[in-house]
Amino acid sequence: MLEFEMDMDQLAQIKVIGVGGGGSNAVNRMIENGLQGVDFISVNTDAQALHLSKAEVKLQLGGKLTRGLGAGANPEIGKKAAEESREQIEEALQGADMVFITAGMGGGTGTGAAPVIAEVAKEIGALTVGVVTRPFTFEGRKRSTQAAAGIAALKEKVDTLIVIPNDRLLEIVDKNTPMLEAFREADNVLRQGVQGISDLIATPGLINLDFADVKTIMKDKGSALMGIGIATGENRAGEAAKKAISSPLLETSLDGAQGVLMNITGGSNLSLYEVHEAAEIVSAASDAEVNMIFGSVINEDLKDEIVVTVIATGFDDAENRRAQQQSNFNRQAAPKQPLKSKEKEAEKKEPRFTSQPEADDNESLDTLDIPAFLRNRRRKSR
């Protein structure tokens, strides 16, 4: 039997960096769930919170600026702290082929520092993917506004950005779920987003993908959406796939996506037929021209469960094409607009003259000075 030595340096190196409180919590959740084949980094301006992180590498941002006391929910301080620690961030990310940046948007550190970290990751040549949450509505308008600005800034710096709207989690969890549990669920969804992609590259399975496959779907693709489906029982594969494509986390249908990455994870009893069934359902829901890649991973802990994760990318390309088509259509229709607006303006100004004979109306349309003409007739009738 032939044996080959595998050089571990040749495998794609994946690093997950949790930024701020929400990001660090998500990293802890990934470590607890035994996420394999990735290196974990936790960064924060809050030294006390950083101490609770389970990541192998911990980095305090902006030691001089914040003195380890946090960013005070101010994204500008988070940004400056990351700029101060830029060299240390680069050192921590060095050697990575792929970097996941995970954060809860709306606070100070995650919102302000994540775009700076993404910029550094891109500079070292890594495929950079952001997986972040948008805050719950009950967290307040200010946090929501800060999150929107942070998401816009981060989108400019990453290859692909997956935004998980926390409000959508309320459609998944029971209405009696305690608030702390709801926040834990948000961390868990961040974990599933990262694991759904990284497992395809780093974990042995029935159908493996290489790093180049994932890069094709995710490089320079802008906005992305994620759907997760979990099912057990006789028709578990089909049900999990249907749940994934109709997941509340997907804010739109898969139709507009240019690329779809799919992960089917099950226990040792996962069959090839089940993988085929799930892939067929997701493929049928996608655009005919979509670039779809899928893989399957074995996780002994799942036993009877199947988890289907769908990442849909390239919505920005489709939106740009639609906008261009609409713009072309508007330009063609433009010459007809002024006449209609003048007619409406005349009708609004002189509503009592609508009963004039049709011939008069047609004559008046040939003149440009409609209001004056109507005013003259009004004087004569008096």
Curated annotation (Swiss-Prot):
Q: Which organism is it from?
A: Halalkalibacterium halodurans (strain ATCC BAA-125 / DSM 18197 / FERM 7344 / JCM 9153 / C-125)
Q: What is its subcellular localisation? A: Cytoplasm
Complexes and interactors: Homodimer. Polymerizes to form a dynamic ring structure in a strictly GTP-dependent manner. Interacts directly with several other division proteins.
Pfam families referenced in this protein's UniProt entry, alphabetically:
FtsZ_C (PF12327), Tubulin (PF00091)
Q: What spans are recorded as compositionally biased (Basic and acidic residues)?
A: 340-352
Give the gene name.
ftsZ
Report the function annotation for this chain.
Answer: Essential cell division protein that forms a contractile ring structure (Z ring) at the future cell division site. The regulation of the ring assembly controls the timing and the location of cell division. One of the functions of the FtsZ ring is to recruit other cell division proteins to the septum to produce a new cell wall between the dividing cells. Binds GTP and shows GTPase activity.
What cellular-component terms does GO give this entry? cell division site; cytoplasm
* UniProt-listed HAMAP family: FtsZ
Which coarse location class describes where this protein primarily resides?
cytoplasm
Q: Does the keyword Nucleotide-binding apply?
A: yes
Biological process (GO), any one:
protein polymerization
Q: Which of UniProt's keywords are assigned here?
A: Cell cycle, Cell division, Cytoplasm, GTP-binding, Nucleotide-binding, Septation
Entry similarity comment: Belongs to the FtsZ family.
Could you cite one Gene Ontology molecular function of this protein?
A: GTP binding
Q: What is this protein called?
A: Cell division protein FtsZ
* Region of interest (Disordered), ranges: 322-382
State the SMART domains in the record.
Answer: Tubulin, Tubulin_C
Residues annotated as binding GTP: 21-25, 108-110, 139, 143, 187
